[in-house]
């Protein structure tokens, strides 16, 4: 009898706790309209890296020396290619240019990075206006990255990202300082 009462109390406690602290199911994350054939134009253009989250600090360590990053996504020479250019402003003031080519995976929402066969990127919608979320997985790491069209999105957007990713087992969180002016994004 005692065990049944205890089990019932724990059950109701769980229901109450779940109603207060609701985490969405992972399946409730909405993948963006990537159909494996062509990248939607709405996602092309300029993006700012705002925040990252991961199960451990080590998975975000690559962003520790970063002040801000500005990206430009453009359609590639083939409809299944996406060209990504970035300029990284380091905390010491240096500007570091980078380029990637993503390949759309037919029949999937995954993006594969050219030259990095172990890396998989999934894009998700964000409830934040002008926001997008990526889930990057590779050999020994998984991280969620939040981007926005504005270098300074509303604080509630960052809080929503942090809350969502903590529900997805991310214990480490990184917010880019964005104290310095963004570096000029090269056109080539």
UniProtKB/Swiss-Prot annotation:
Keyword annotations: Disulfide bond, Glycoprotein, HDL, Lipid transport, Secreted, Signal, Transport
Cleavable signal peptide: 1-22
Any one GO MF annotation of this record: lipid transporter activity
Recorded superkingdom: Eukaryota
Major site of localization recorded for this protein: secreted
Keyword Glycoprotein tagged: yes
Residues the entry annotates as binding tetradecanoate: 136, 143
Protein's GO biological process: cholesterol efflux; high-density lipoprotein particle assembly; high-density lipoprotein particle clearance; high-density lipoprotein particle remodeling
Compartment annotation: Secreted
Disulfide linkage: 23-167, 95-183, 128-157
Glycosylation sites: 135
Any one Gene Ontology cellular component term annotated for this protein: very-low-density lipoprotein particle
Entry function: Probably involved in lipid transport. Can bind sphingosine-1-phosphate, myristic acid, palmitic acid and stearic acid, retinol, all-trans-retinoic acid and 9-cis-retinoic acid.
Family as reported in the entry's similarity comment: Belongs to the calycin superfamily. Lipocalin family. Highly divergent.
Quaternary structure and interacting proteins, as annotated: Interacts with LRP2; LRP2 mediates APOM renal uptake and subsequent lysosomal degradation.
Protein known as: Apolipoprotein M
Organism annotation: Pongo abelii
Biological classification of the source: Eukaryota, Metazoa, Chordata, Craniata, Vertebrata
């Amino acid at each position: 009898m005692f065990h049944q009462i205890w089990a019932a109390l724990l059950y109701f406690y769980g229901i109450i706790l779940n109603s207060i602290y609701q985490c969405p199911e992972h399946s409730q994350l909405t993948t963006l309209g990537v159909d494996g054939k062509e990248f939607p134009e709405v996602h092309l253009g300029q993006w700012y890296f705002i925040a990252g989250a991961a199960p451990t600090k080590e998975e975000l360590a690559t962003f520790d020396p970063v002040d801000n990053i500005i990206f430009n996504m453009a359609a590639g020479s083939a409809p299944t290619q996406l060209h990504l250019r970035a300029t990284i402003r380091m905390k010491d003031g240096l500007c570091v240019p980078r380029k990637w080519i993503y390949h759309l995976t037919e029949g999937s929402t995954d993006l594969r990075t050219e030259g990095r066969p172990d890396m998989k990127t999934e894009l998700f919608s964000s409830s934040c206006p002008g926001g997008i979320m990526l889930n990057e997985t590779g050999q020994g790491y998984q991280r969620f990255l939040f981007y926005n069209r504005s270098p300074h999105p509303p604080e509630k957007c960052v809080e929503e990202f942090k809350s969502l990713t903590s529900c997805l087992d991310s214990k480490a969180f990184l917010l880019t300082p964005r104290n310095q002016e963004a570096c000029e994004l090269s056109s080539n």
